[in-house]
Amino acid sequence: MENKKTIYFLCTGNSCRSQMAEAWGKKYLGNAWNVFSAGIEAHGVNPNAVRAMKEVGIDISDQTSDVIDSDILNKADLIVTLCSHADSVCPTTPTHVNRVHWGFDDPAGKEWPEFQRVRDEIGARIKKFAETGE
Protein backbone atom coordinates (compact mmCIF):
# COMPACT_ATOMS: atom_id res chain seq x y z
CA MET A 1 0.00 0.00 0.00
CA GLU A 2 2.95 2.31 -0.71
CA ASN A 3 3.52 5.27 1.60
CA LYS A 4 -0.05 6.45 1.38
CA LYS A 5 -2.38 6.35 4.35
CA THR A 6 -5.42 4.06 4.05
CA ILE A 7 -9.02 5.16 4.59
CA TYR A 8 -11.78 2.54 4.81
CA PHE A 9 -15.43 3.56 4.37
CA LEU A 10 -17.93 1.15 5.96
CA CYS A 11 -21.71 0.85 5.86
CA THR A 12 -24.27 -1.92 6.12
CA GLY A 13 -24.40 -3.35 2.58
CA ASN A 14 -21.58 -1.64 0.63
CA SER A 15 -24.28 -0.76 -1.88
CA CYS A 16 -24.89 3.01 -1.82
CA ARG A 17 -23.27 5.27 0.78
CA SER A 18 -19.90 3.57 1.10
CA GLN A 19 -19.72 3.12 -2.68
CA MET A 20 -20.27 6.84 -3.20
CA ALA A 21 -17.82 7.63 -0.40
CA GLU A 22 -15.16 5.44 -2.02
CA ALA A 23 -15.62 7.30 -5.30
CA TRP A 24 -15.51 10.75 -3.67
CA GLY A 25 -12.54 9.61 -1.61
CA LYS A 26 -10.63 8.58 -4.71
CA LYS A 27 -11.44 11.95 -6.28
CA TYR A 28 -10.51 14.15 -3.33
CA LEU A 29 -8.00 12.00 -1.40
CA GLY A 30 -6.50 9.71 -4.03
CA ASN A 31 -3.09 11.39 -4.13
CA ALA A 32 -2.50 10.91 -0.40
CA TRP A 33 -4.75 7.99 0.57
CA ASN A 34 -5.53 4.43 -0.49
CA VAL A 35 -9.34 4.43 -0.55
CA PHE A 36 -11.49 1.35 0.09
CA SER A 37 -15.08 0.60 1.05
CA ALA A 38 -16.91 -2.42 2.42
CA GLY A 39 -20.03 -3.49 4.26
CA ILE A 40 -21.16 -5.73 7.06
CA GLU A 41 -22.76 -7.61 4.13
CA ALA A 42 -22.29 -7.25 0.36
CA HIS A 43 -25.59 -6.31 -1.29
CA GLY A 44 -24.20 -5.40 -4.72
CA VAL A 45 -23.66 -1.89 -6.03
CA ASN A 46 -27.01 -0.10 -6.25
CA PRO A 47 -27.72 0.99 -9.86
CA ASN A 48 -29.00 4.34 -8.59
CA ALA A 49 -25.70 4.94 -6.79
CA VAL A 50 -23.94 4.30 -10.12
CA ARG A 51 -26.37 6.67 -11.85
CA ALA A 52 -26.00 9.36 -9.16
CA MET A 53 -22.22 9.35 -9.38
CA LYS A 54 -22.31 9.30 -13.19
CA GLU A 55 -24.40 12.47 -13.01
CA VAL A 56 -21.40 14.23 -11.40
CA GLY A 57 -18.91 12.71 -13.84
CA ILE A 58 -17.64 9.83 -11.68
CA ASP A 59 -17.91 6.26 -13.00
CA ILE A 60 -18.31 3.64 -10.27
CA SER A 61 -19.66 0.88 -12.52
CA ASP A 62 -16.45 -1.14 -12.01
CA GLN A 63 -16.53 -0.91 -8.21
CA THR A 64 -17.48 -4.09 -6.38
CA SER A 65 -19.59 -4.65 -3.29
CA ASP A 66 -17.39 -6.28 -0.66
CA VAL A 67 -17.61 -7.50 2.91
CA ILE A 68 -15.16 -6.07 5.43
CA ASP A 69 -11.61 -7.33 4.85
CA SER A 70 -9.85 -7.80 8.19
CA ASP A 71 -6.45 -7.17 6.58
CA ILE A 72 -7.48 -3.74 5.26
CA LEU A 73 -9.32 -3.06 8.53
CA ASN A 74 -6.22 -3.77 10.60
CA LYS A 75 -3.90 -1.73 8.36
CA ALA A 76 -6.22 1.26 7.91
CA ASP A 77 -5.17 4.65 9.24
CA LEU A 78 -8.78 5.82 9.34
CA ILE A 79 -12.07 3.92 9.40
CA VAL A 80 -15.20 5.93 8.59
CA THR A 81 -18.60 4.41 9.36
CA LEU A 82 -21.41 5.99 7.36
CA CYS A 83 -24.56 4.70 9.08
CA SER A 84 -25.56 3.87 12.62
CA HIS A 85 -25.83 0.13 11.87
CA ALA A 86 -22.23 -0.16 10.70
CA ASP A 87 -21.11 2.03 13.59
CA SER A 88 -22.71 -0.28 16.14
CA VAL A 89 -21.77 -3.68 14.69
CA CYS A 90 -18.43 -2.82 13.09
CA PRO A 91 -15.75 -5.33 14.06
CA THR A 92 -13.39 -4.41 16.85
CA THR A 93 -10.70 -2.15 15.47
CA PRO A 94 -7.08 -2.05 16.61
CA THR A 95 -6.15 0.77 18.96
CA HIS A 96 -3.83 2.37 16.39
CA VAL A 97 -6.71 2.81 13.94
CA ASN A 98 -8.63 6.05 14.17
CA ARG A 99 -12.37 5.43 13.77
CA VAL A 100 -14.96 8.14 13.15
CA HIS A 101 -18.67 8.11 12.33
CA TRP A 102 -20.15 10.31 9.61
CA GLY A 103 -23.85 9.47 9.51
CA PHE A 104 -25.83 9.71 6.27
CA ASP A 105 -29.38 8.64 5.43
CA ASP A 106 -29.70 5.41 3.44
CA PRO A 107 -31.09 6.29 -0.01
CA ALA A 108 -31.76 2.64 -0.96
CA GLY A 109 -35.40 2.15 -1.90
CA LYS A 110 -36.05 5.90 -1.86
CA GLU A 111 -36.90 8.37 -4.61
CA TRP A 112 -34.20 9.65 -7.00
CA PRO A 113 -33.76 13.07 -5.29
CA GLU A 114 -32.73 11.22 -2.11
CA PHE A 115 -29.81 9.61 -3.96
CA GLN A 116 -28.75 13.00 -5.28
CA ARG A 117 -28.99 14.62 -1.84
CA VAL A 118 -27.03 11.88 -0.07
CA ARG A 119 -24.43 11.83 -2.87
CA ASP A 120 -23.90 15.57 -2.51
CA GLU A 121 -23.74 15.40 1.31
CA ILE A 122 -21.13 12.63 1.20
CA GLY A 123 -19.11 14.50 -1.44
CA ALA A 124 -19.16 17.71 0.60
CA ARG A 125 -18.09 15.88 3.78
CA ILE A 126 -15.16 14.15 2.08
CA LYS A 127 -14.11 17.38 0.35
CA LYS A 128 -14.11 19.08 3.77
CA PHE A 129 -11.96 16.28 5.18
CA ALA A 130 -9.55 16.62 2.22
CA GLU A 131 -9.26 20.36 2.84
CA THR A 132 -9.14 20.44 6.65
CA GLY A 133 -8.18 16.96 7.82
CA GLU A 134 -11.35 16.89 9.93
From Swiss-Prot:
It catalyses: arsenate + [thioredoxin]-dithiol + H(+) = arsenite + [thioredoxin]-disulfide + H2O. Gene3D superfamilies: 3.40.50.2300. SMART domains: LMWPc. GO terms for biological process: response to arsenic-containing substance. The keyword Cytoplasm applies. Catalyzes the reduction of arsenate [As(V)] to arsenite [As(III)]. Belongs to the low molecular weight phosphotyrosine protein phosphatase family. Thioredoxin-coupled ArsC subfamily. NCBIfam families: arsC_pI258_fam, PRK13530.1. This is Arsenate reductase. It comes from Brevibacillus brevis (strain 47 / JCM 6285 / NBRC 100599).
